[in-house]
Amino acid sequence: MAKLVTENISKRFKNQDVLKHINITLENNEVYGLLGINGAGKTTLMKIICGILQQDSGEIKLDNRPMTRNDLHKVGSLIETPATYNHLSAQDNLKIVCLNESVDFSEINSVLSLVNLNVDKKKKIKDFSLGMKQRLGIAMALIKKPEILVLDEPSNGLDPYGIQELRELLKLLTEQGTSIIISSHILSEIQVLADHIGIIHEGELKYQQRNNKDENLEEIFFKITKGDYK
């Protein structure tokens, strides 16, 4: 059963069509991998799903009904870089999220453990590595236990161990009932993580298939981005 469906989502900035009639389907408890070169429209689509941007036309459905502003608490997201207060600690940043989302502070330690971010409670975000900031951003997205998790390039700044931990975390989350949309520039990583894969190019969804790990995704991607894919 589909958890979330976008129906003919379109968006223009000034005179440029950034998204053109995008139709994607995120199934329950699965990972949807979104691929595309810089400027293809991936982040714009994710921002629309999260309610950060409004589409010009089209509709989003959640659990087979039109999605409204009241449903946005069901969506957790990490879009681009985490929005943090760099003079505060990870715990204090999460307390602010908890206050905004009406979440009990008791969830903080468990979500930090979940993303394997065990740091000195006095350590400020300004002293975090890029990978640590990414882990915190994922924790901030997860603290309200969303039904849908939207992650834009979550492996940025992670070392190989961190990427492996991310894989294990996403697997655990889907087993617990979370549906996930993830974007990446790393084709091989999407092919490992995703149940379905979509490729956006020049604002259009050029490819959408169930993940076939035997398929040459790199060849398909380069044919699409060069305009040779049929």
Q: What residues fall within each predicted segment?
A:
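Catalytic Walker B motif of ABC-type/P-loop ATPase nucleotide-binding domains
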Residues: L149-E153
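Conserved structural motif at the start of ABC-family nucleotide-binding domains
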Residues: L4-T6, L19-H21
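Helix-to-loop junction immediately C-terminal to a conserved catalytic motif
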Residues: C50
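Hydrophobic anchor residue at the start of the ABC signature
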Residues: I138
